[in-house]
């Protein structure tokens, strides 16, 4: 998704049922440190995000504000990095450029080679204005469906989803899979 001016956040905040909006920016990069490299994505969130936070394996939230680049312990190991080291991030969107970023912290997550940064600091490091590529919304309970329909009709919206709907769908799929497996195991048991 091409990033755009963050002014769209104000338009989203005015939609009915929206109680809070946080901007995000995802930037595809190749990290380089010495002879090691790894393709990844820098996930730029509001420094003091509430709706979408970086949470470690022990369920502790990490504040991004003033931290520089925050990477997972697995990405740090793969690149041979420690806190305080500087790596090169080759940006793979927009105009070609490379930026040196200092690792401010590592976070232990269950999976992934992830990298995070305060969105405003990320934009400054890239020499960009106030850009965003996505938004996280808090919505009044029970009004999600109407809002999703309204959002899908907006220009430049690539997709919209509800966490509650996704969770409900996953639960339905899991329940169906349990029923199928129970039926199969019952058939096997009756044959034996």
Named regions from a protein language model:
Residues 1-66, 70-74, 82-85, 169, ...:
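Juxtamembrane segments of multi-pass membrane proteins
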Residues 15-19, 81, 93-98, 154-158:
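Secondary-structure transition/capping motifs at alpha-helix termini
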Residues 22-25, 88, 136, 159-161:
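Residues embedded in well-ordered beta-strands within globular domains across many folds
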Residues 25, 61-122:
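Hydrophobic secondary-structure segments that place a key small or acidic residue at a functional site
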Residues 53, 63-64, 106-155, 159, ...:
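Small-residue transmembrane helix packing/gating motifs
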Residues 78-82, 126-129, 173:
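A short glycine-leucine-enriched loop at secondary-structure breakpoints
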Residues 158-180:
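Juxtamembrane "pre-transmembrane" interface segments
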Residues 175-192:
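Hydrophobic alpha-helical transmembrane segments of multi-pass inner-membrane transport and secretion
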